């Protein structure tokens, strides 16, 4: 089993739910990214999603768009993100890291070169927002050949056919976008999430993480009751946007620890 599979197997055995925080690599300071990754892990993150900044992040709301713009302005590239993962791996060999981003930077590097470099850096999974599953079969095969899990998005509008397509090629976990629209938008309707998850789990043989609209311990716990993992991003990016530079890592760790405690309570309730 790879790191993602080991993580979810351990969570299932312990009756706990996964916590998957997202930050944008290089924001607000490229020199702080690895420190922030360690803060997430120390706070209780099970998997870290590391955003690769892109100039046209179509699925992201204004908070993450701004973070991408700041990172790009500071010279962050796919290569520098891979270097961050490699530095993180110098002292953390256990926490899975998933790169989340768009196809263009990967295609500019070349899919084969990306697979080789990502594997060497210690990347465990990759979620490419604009690779629909019906067109991503070859990409998914190349990622798996490099021991990297191809992770795909599902949404409230996903048909049973689309869910089945994802089920055929996904590994690691799937990311269920709980709201229509962009990241950081709207209010959660946990009952609608609960209604969709069984259809996903009947067709997809990997854990289901739920994201978009999760902002605090209360919403995280509610979503954890009906899913395998909770993904939180925009709230963390906002936290880093507003925190004093010298206290940002500590604030991140504290916030993640609060979510971890809430999720552990949800896991115990669910058993």
UniProtKB/Swiss-Prot annotation:
Keywords: Amino-acid biosynthesis, Aromatic amino acid biosynthesis, Lyase, Tryptophan biosynthesis. Belongs to the TrpA family. PROSITE patterns: TRP_SYNTHASE_ALPHA. Pathway: Amino-acid biosynthesis; L-tryptophan biosynthesis; L-tryptophan from chorismate: step 5/5. GO terms for molecular function: tryptophan synthase activity. Coiled coil: none annotated. Gene3D superfamilies: Aldolase class I (3.20.20.70). It is an enzyme of class 4 (lyase). Tetramer of two alpha and two beta chains. GO terms for cellular component: cytosol. It comes from Burkholderia ambifaria (strain MC40-6). Its EC number is 4.2.1.20. HAMAP family: Trp_synth_alpha. This is Tryptophan synthase alpha chain. The keyword Amino-acid biosynthesis applies. Transmembrane segments: none annotated. CDD domains: Tryptophan_synthase_alpha (cd04724). It catalyses: (1S,2R)-1-C-(indol-3-yl)glycerol 3-phosphate + L-serine = D-glyceraldehyde 3-phosphate + L-tryptophan + H2O. The alpha subunit is responsible for the aldol cleavage of indoleglycerol phosphate to indole and glyceraldehyde 3-phosphate. The active site is at 49 (proton acceptor), 60 (proton acceptor). NCBIfam families: trpA (TIGR00262). It comes from the Bacteria.
